[in-house]
C-alpha cells in the first residue's frame, strides 16, 4: 500500500538496555525496538513490555521534517505529564510500567487531531530480556564485569552551574552481560526521588539529569554486577548556585591593538555572568570637536549590539575590516544585566603602509632624539615649579585643635551606565552615558535633587512641560502619579499626553534612587514594543528624578477581568453593578496572545521578568495588554518569598519549582509563570492560584507533580498549553515564540461572538467548597489534577463555549 508523503511519519517503540540475564528486582529497564515506518491511523504497532520497565514511544517524520504541535493520548484520553509519565512533543516515557499502563497509545496533531501513529502496548509480569540472543550457553570467557573505558572515568568531581545538564557514565562489559544500578549518597536512586526525574541509558551505561539544582549535590555511585562479581564507581556532583552580580569581564580584554592601514582587526571581550548579559561594542567619537558632553560623559557610537539571532559568543568579538585612519581610537566592551553594568576599553592605533614607514624612518630617528631631551628638560622645570608653588601656598602649622571638616556636596558614588538601544550606528549623538550614582550604604536622602544625574538628550523632558496629577499607586521604593506631558508626541509637540510618572517617596534612600535609575536604564536598553510598558522620557535635572512611562487607563489585568465578571459572584468586584462589558472567548485568548508577544520580545532582548502575573500586566484604554515592571532590579537572594504583596497575594504561587526551591531564574521559569497567568485569565476575577492551599502544602504538592485543574471556562487546547508550561523539566516547556504561534492559531479559529459562561459557583475554585475566598484546605482533587485529562475538544481546535 502506498502511503501519501504528507502523512508519512516514523513511529518508534523504544526498548533499550536489554540483557541476556533477567534483571534484578531493583533494576529498571528501558525497552527499545527497531525503527519502523509509522502506520496509518487505522494500523497499530504491537509492543510488549515487562512489569517495571521504562516504556519509551517515539513518533517523528523521516528526515527530521516537523510534524507540528502534538499531544499523546491513551485509549482516546489525553495524557498529562507527571513524575512517572514524561510527555514530550514527539516522545512519551512511562516509568516503572504496570498492568494499568497497557492500552492503545496514539500521537495526534494538537490542533487538527490527526492521528500520526498508534501503539498497542501490552505489559507482562516477566521483565524484558531485550533483543539479545538467549544467554543459556555460557561462553568460554565468562567472568566478572570490567570497565571498558576507564580513561573516561578519571574525573570524579564535577562542578556545574545550576540549570545545566549532567551525565555520569560507567561503560562496562562482562559475560554474562552485567546489569547497572545507581545510588545517591549510598541509597537507591530513582526518577521519583528528583523533581524533573532522571534518564537511565542502560545501553550507554549512563545517568542523565537535566536542569540540575543545588539539591542535586551529592555522591552518585554506579553498581555494575553479574553472577561472577560486581564493580562500582562513585562521582561527586557539586551544583554551583547562581548569585546575583553584575557581569565580570576578563582582565586584559579587550587588548590594545596596532594595525597597518587596510588590514583586519579583532577585539575580544570575555564576559562571565550568571544573569543573562547584554553585550554592546562602542566607539568613542567626537562631537563638535569634543569627546565628552557638557556633563563630562563621553560621546560614543554603538557598533554592535544584541539582535534576535545573535549569540553571546558572537557578541564577544568585534571585527573591523580594511581599517582606515578614521578607525583609530578608543573602543569599549559594555556588558550589563539586571544587577548592573561593567565595561573595559582598548585603543586601536592605525599605522601607514610599510613603504611610507621606510621613507620616514631616518628623519624620525633624528627628531626622536631631540624630542626626548626636550621632554625630560620640560618635566624637570614643571616639577621644580610645582614644589615652589606648594610651599608658598601651604598654611602655617597650628597646634592640636578640632579636626578639619570637609563639606561633601555629593554622596560617595558608584558607576552606572545609560544606554539607548535603538539608535543609529552612524549617529553622532551621545548614545551612552557613563554617569555617577549614589553608593549603596543606604542613608536617607534629605533632598534627592542634590544628587546630580547626567542629562540624556534623547529622553530628557523639561519640568515646565510636565503637570502632575492624582496618585495612581505606591511601589516598594516609590510612587506613581498621573500627569500631563507636552512634547512627548513628536508629531504633535504641543498636544498634552497622559503619562504615568514614577518618582521616589520623601523617605527614599540612595539605594532606592539607584534602583529607580537602574529600572530607567534597563527600559532604555530593552527598547520599545507594543505589549510592554514603554519609557517615554525622564526629568533628571533641577529636581527629583521623574521617570515617565506609558499610562494604562484600565489598570492591571486582574482587576480588568474582575470588573467584567457577571454580577452575583461571591468574589466579584462589585456585585451591585453590571459588568462594564461582556467578554468573549476571543477576548481572553487575545489577552493571553498579547502577553505572550510581549514576553517573546523581552526574551529576545535577554530580559528575564521573574514576577510575571496578571497584577503586573496593565491594560490601556484600547484593551492593549502591556507587561510592566520588567526592568526592576530584584535581589532574588534576599527576597522574602513568604511575604504577602500589597494585595495580599503570595508571589510563590506564580514561581516555577526551580525558582521556588533553588532560586534559579531563566526564560523557562518565566514560561511557568505564564502558565499560571493563563489560569488567571480563564478564571476571570477569581481567587488567587491554588485557592485555599497553605504554602507548606503547596510545596509538597508541586514536588509530587500535582498541577491545578482545568478552569471551567477553559478549552482543552488552552489547558494543554498550561500543562506544557508547568512541565517539571524546564527544557521541556515551550518557548515564548512557540506560545505565540500556538495562541495565534487558536485565536484565528475562535469566533468573535462566543460568550463565556462565567456563572460558575465559587466551589469550582475552592477545594473545600466554602462560601468565602478565605477558606483554607489541605488541597483536594477539585483544585489539583494528577490524572489524565478529560476528552479533547472538537477537531477544529477552537475553544468551546
From Swiss-Prot:
Residues 125-146, 762-801 are annotated as: Disordered. ATP binds at residues 472-480, 502. The modification Phosphoserine is found at residues 438-439. GO terms for biological process: alveolar secondary septum development; astrocyte differentiation; axonogenesis involved in innervation; bone development; bone maturation; bone mineralization; bone morphogenesis; bone trabecula morphogenesis. The keyword Kinase applies. One of its GO terms (molecular function) is ATP binding. Keywords: Apoptosis, ATP-binding, Cell membrane, Cytoplasmic vesicle, Disulfide bond, Endoplasmic reticulum, Glycoprotein, Immunoglobulin domain, Kinase, Membrane, Nucleotide-binding, Phosphoprotein, Receptor, Repeat, Signal, Transferase, Transmembrane, Transmembrane helix, Tyrosine-protein kinase, Ubl conjugation. The keyword Transmembrane helix applies. Residues 21-369 are extracellular. It is found in: Cell membrane; Cytoplasmic vesicle; Endoplasmic reticulum. Present in an inactive conformation in the absence of bound ligand. Ligand binding leads to dimerization and activation by autophosphorylation on tyrosine residues. Glycans are attached at residues 96, 219, 256, 288, 309, 322. It catalyses: L-tyrosyl-[protein] + ATP = O-phospho-L-tyrosyl-[protein] + ADP + H(+). This is Fibroblast growth factor receptor 3. It comes from Mus musculus (Mouse). The gene is Fgfr3.
Amino acid at each position: 500500500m502506498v502511503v501519501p508523503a504528507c502523512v508519512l511519519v516514523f513511529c518508534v517503540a523504544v526498548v533499550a538496555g536489554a540483557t541476556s540475564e533477567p534483571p534484578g528486582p531493583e533494576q529498571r529497564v528501558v525497552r527499545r525496538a527497531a525503527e519502523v515506518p509509522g502506520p496509518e491511523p487505522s494500523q497499530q504497532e504491537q509492543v510488549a513490555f515487562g512489569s517495571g520497565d521504562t516504556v519509551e514511544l517515539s513518533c517523528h517524520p523521516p528526515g527530521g521534517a516537523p510534524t507540528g504541535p502534538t499531544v499523546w493520548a491513551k485509549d482516546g484520553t489525553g495524557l498529562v505529564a507527571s513524575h512517572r509519565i514524561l510527555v514530550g512533543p514527539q516522545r512519551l516515557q512511562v516509568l516503572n510500567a504496570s498492568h494499568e499502563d497497557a492500552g492503545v497509545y496514539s500521537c495526534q496533531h494538537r490542533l487538527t487531531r490527526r492521528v500520526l501513529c498508534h501503539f498497542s502496548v501490552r505489559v507482562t509480569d516477566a521483565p524484558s530480556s531485550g533483543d539479545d540472543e538467549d544467554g543459556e550457553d555460557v561462553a568460554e570467557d565468562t567472568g566478572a564485569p570490567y570497565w571498558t573505558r576507564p580513561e573516561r572515568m578519571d574525573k570524579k568531581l564535577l562542578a556545574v552551574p545550576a540549570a545545566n545538564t549532567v551525565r555520569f557514565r560507567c561503560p562496562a562489559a562482562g559475560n554474562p552481560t552485567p546489569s547497572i544500578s545507581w545510588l545517591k549518597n549510598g541509597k537507591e536512586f530513582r526518577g521519583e526521588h528528583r523533581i524533573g526525574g532522571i534518564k537511565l541509558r542502560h545501553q550507554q551505561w549512563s545517568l542523565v539529569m537535566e536542569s540540575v539544582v543545588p539539591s542535586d549535590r551529592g555522591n552518585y555511585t554506579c553498581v555494575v554486577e553479574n553472577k561472577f562479581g560486581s564493580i562500582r564507581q562513585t562521582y561527586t556532583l557539586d551544583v554551583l548556585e547562581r548569585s546575583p552580580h553584575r557581569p565580570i569581564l576578563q582582565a586584559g580584554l579587550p587588548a590594545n591593538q596596532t594595525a597597518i592601514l587596510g588590514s583586519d582587526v579583532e577585539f575580544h571581550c570575555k564576559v562571565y555572568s550568571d544573569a543573562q548579559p547584554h553585550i554592546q561594542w562602542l566607539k568613542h567619537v567626537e562631537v563638535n570637536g569634543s569627546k565628552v558632553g557638557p556633563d563630562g560623559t563621553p560621546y560614543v557610537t554603538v557598533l554592535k549590539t544584541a539582535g534576535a539571532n545573535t549569540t553571546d559568543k558572537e557578541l564577544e568579538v568585534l571585527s573591523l575590516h580594511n581599517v582606515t585612519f578614521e578607525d583609530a581610537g578608543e573602543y569599549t566592551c559594555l556588558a550589563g544585566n539586571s544587577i548592573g553594568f561593567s565595561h573595559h576599553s582598548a585603543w586601536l592605533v592605525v599605522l601607514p603602509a610599510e613603504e611610507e614607514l621606510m621613507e620616514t624612518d631616518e628623519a624620525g630617528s633624528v627628531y626622536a632624539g631631540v624630542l626626548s631631551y626636550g621632554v625630560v628638560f620640560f618635566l624637570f622645570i614643571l616639577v621644580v615649579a610645582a614644589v615652589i608653588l606648594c610651599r608658598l601656598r601651604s598654611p602655617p602649622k597650628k597646634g592640636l585643635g578640632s579636626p578639619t571638616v570637609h563639606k561633601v556636596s555629593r554622596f560617595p558614588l558608584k558607576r552606572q551606565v545609560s544606554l539607548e538601544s535603538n539608535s543609529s550606528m552612524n549617529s553622532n549623538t551621545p548614545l551612552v552615558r557613563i554617569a555617577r550614582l549614589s553608593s549603596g550604604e543606604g542613608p536617607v536622602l534629605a533632598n534627592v535633587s542634590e544628587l546630580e544625574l547626567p542629562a540624556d538628550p534623547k529622553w530628557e523632558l523639561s519640568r515646565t512641560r510636565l503637570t502632575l496629577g492624582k496618585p495612581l499607586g505606591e511601589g516598594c521604593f516609590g510612587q506613581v502619579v498621573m500627569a500631563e506631558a507636552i512634547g512627548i508626541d513628536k508629531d504633535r509637540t504641543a498636544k498634552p499626553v497622559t503619562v504615568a510618572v514614577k518618582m521616589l517617596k520623601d523617605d527614599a534612600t540612595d539605594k532606592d534612587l539607584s534602583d529607580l535609575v537602574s529600572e530607567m536604564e534597563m527600559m532604555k536598553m530593552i527598547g520599545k514594543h507594543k505589549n510592554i510598558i514603554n519609557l517615554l522620557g525622564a526629568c533628571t535635572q533641577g529636581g527629583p528624578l521623574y521617570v515617565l512611562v506609558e499610562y494604562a487607563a484600565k489598570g492591571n489585568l486582574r482587576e480588568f477581568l474582575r470588573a467584567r465578571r457577571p454580577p452575583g459572584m461571591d468574589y466579584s468586584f462589585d456585585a451591585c453593578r453590571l459588568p462594564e462589558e461582556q467578554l468573549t472567548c476571543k477576548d481572553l485568548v487575545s489577552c493571553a496572545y498579547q502577553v505572550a508577544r510581549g514576553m517573546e520580545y523581552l526574551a529576545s532582548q535577554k530580559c528575564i521578568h521573574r514576577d510575571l502575573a496578571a497584577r503586573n500586566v496593565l491594560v490601556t484604554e484600547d484593551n492593549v495588554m502591556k507587561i510592566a515592571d520588567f526592568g526592576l532590579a530584584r535581589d532574588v537572594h534576599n527576597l522574602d518569598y513568604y511575604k504577602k504583596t500589597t494585595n495580599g497575594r503570595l508571589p510563590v504561587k506564580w514561581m516555577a519549582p526551580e525558582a521556588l526551591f533553588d532560586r534559579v531564574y531563566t526564560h523557562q521559569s518565566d514560561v511557568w509563570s505564564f502558565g499560571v497567568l493563563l489560569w488567571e485569565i480563564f478564571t476571570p476575577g477569581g481567587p488567587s492560584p491554588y485557592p485555599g492551599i497553605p504554602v507548606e502544602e503547596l510545596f509538597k504538592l508541586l514536588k509530587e507533580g500535582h498541577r491545578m485543574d482545568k478552569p471551567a471556562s477553559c478549552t482543552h487546547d488552552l489547558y494543554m498549553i498550561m500543562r506544557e508550561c508547568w512541565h517539571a523539566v524546564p527544557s521541556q516547556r515551550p518557548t515564548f515564540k512557540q506560545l505565540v504561534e500556538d495562541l495565534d492559531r487558536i485565536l484565528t479559529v475562535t469566533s468573535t461572538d462566543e460568550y463565556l459562561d462565567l456563572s460558575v459557583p465559587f466551589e469550582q475554585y475552592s477545594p473545600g467548597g466554602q462560601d468565602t475566598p478565605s477558606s483554607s484546605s489541605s488541597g483536594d482533587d477539585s483544585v489539583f489534577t494528577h490524572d489524565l485529562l478529560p476528552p479533547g475538544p472538537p477537531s477544529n481546535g477552537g475553544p468551546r463555549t
